[in-house]
Amino acid sequence: MGPPLAQELTQACNQPLAATSNLQPDDGYKIELRAENGVDKYPAKQHARKVAAQIRQGKGLIFLMGQKSTLHEDSDQERSLRQRRYFFYLSGVDEADCDLTYDIKTDKLTLYVPDFDLRRAIWMGPTLERKSALQKFDVDEVNYHSALDEDVKKWAKNQGPGSTIYLLHGSQGPTDNPSNVIIDTKTLKLAMDACRVIKDEHEIQLIRRANDISAAAHIEILRGITSMSNESHVEGSFLNTCVSLGAHKQAYQIIAASGSNAATLHYSKNNEPLRGRQFVCLDAGAEWNCYASDVTRTFPITHQWPSIEAKQIYQLVQEMQESCIALVKEGVRYLDLHFLAHNILIKGFLTLGIFKGGTLDEVKKSGASLLFFPHGLGHYIGLEVHDVSPQSIMAQGINDDSNNMLILPTCVSPCTTSSPALTSGMVITIEPGIYFSQLALENAKPEQLKYIDMARVKNYMAVGGVRIEDDILVTKTGHENLTKVPKGDDMLEIIRQGKKGNDSHHV
């Protein structure tokens, strides 16, 4: 069930790729994608210098191993490559069996590629060759892997006793560590995490492209949802569009959850029928050159709001998200946005009669809102979908006691008390949600149930869950929303126009 969008796109070097569809090309949503040929090299050398500056030592050797090619257990089939992200950050290389060194003192970044293997080249295609690798990647020198250990020994000899080799993990170092060097396995990760949290322009463009591809896939599903009958069709359509646009990998397991399945945060079966259900919650994001996107939209299976309750919950989540996004700028403490989202939820539930018999602060202190919004507002995004955070420092701001209940153990940076304030170059997600989980409600504490009208809640159980998620770049003047997928009434209009196109194809 391939989406028409994927069939219309032409991937020619230096040609724009327009995400249009013959279902309804005039619905106003076109995602323009441009081929990457001609884009500057991934700035590996710049990253190496940033990391060295964080290490704050005038000399030493950074040593990073790339991912090795391996077979599945008890099989002759290779595992799909997922490059080690720390290695990629200092190399830009997404190929197996490579390593690198960076000499801090001489500012020399060296890439080591596999030695030529004729048999493997015949079966799998040639691996990287020194000359082409030097042209392709932002490194100073390329050597074959067989020279690595000897090169490290020569470096250690020239440096003298007490020189330091910085490793990410003790098991990921030279085969034969020189005896006169210090092996440091703590400093490098902290330094790289501090660098990775602030994206440069090249990284932002990669995240932007991943988002554009994801947007094209999400929009195509909105256009076709009325003709789909199973969660698997939603997942298949998303994958089809992404692969057609050159994104062969997903940043994470696709969540295509309909009805009550959407109350399971990381639902992944994606195999149940859509009939009789109100919403689909689609959490899916393409990966581009190892950089992630993370996009969630919740939409009706028909071309209209399926119930008054569904519309009420959707609009409340949309208010939570848009209110939080509007406040994103440098200096803001992300955790305060998380608290704001809970406040909006509680006020909304008091208005709807789902919460009763208490003030906003009383309900908040009870933790009742956590039964319906049981995760953090979002996270960093980059080389990982839940990207690394800088070394924890106590963020400015005082935590109101009434908010303490809302800081969950599952909250990840920047949604923690120790996360730094938002800074230009950070890319974060804003992803509030409201879920009606039977399991959560059955295990609620008495102090939470005190403020919940369970008879009223029953009217909302069929909604399942609603989550809306965008990727937000923090800028010096505020923020930029990198996710170009419509919401609310604009979303419904695309579904309506898509239904017209689908109906015309069946005449």
From Swiss-Prot:
Cross-referenced InterPro entries: Aminopep_P_N, Creatin/AminoP/Spt16_N, Creatinase/aminopeptidase-like, Pept_M24, Peptidase_M24B_aminopep-P_CS, X-Pro_dipept-like
Keyword Lipoprotein among UniProt keywords: no
PROSITE patterns associated with the record: PROLINE_PEPTIDASE
Catalytic activity: Release of any N-terminal amino acid, including proline, that is linked to proline, even from a dipeptide or tripeptide
Sample GO molecular function, one term: manganese ion binding
GO biological process: proteolysis
Gene3D superfamilies hit by this protein: Creatinase/methionine aminopeptidase superfamily, Creatinase/prolidase N-terminal domain
Keywords attached to this entry: Aminopeptidase, Hydrolase, Manganese, Metal-binding, Metalloprotease, Protease
Binding positions for Mn(2+) 1 per the UniProt entry: D294, E431, E469
Job of this protein: Catalyzes the removal of a penultimate prolyl residue from the N-termini of peptides.
PANTHER family referenced in this protein's UniProt entry, alphabetically: XAA-PRO AMINOPEPTIDASE 3 (PTHR43226), XAA-PRO AMINOPEPTIDASE AN0832-RELATED (PTHR43226:SF3)
Protein name, as recorded: Probable Xaa-Pro aminopeptidase HCAG_02413
Originating species: Ajellomyces capsulatus (strain NAm1 / WU24) (Darling's disease fungus)
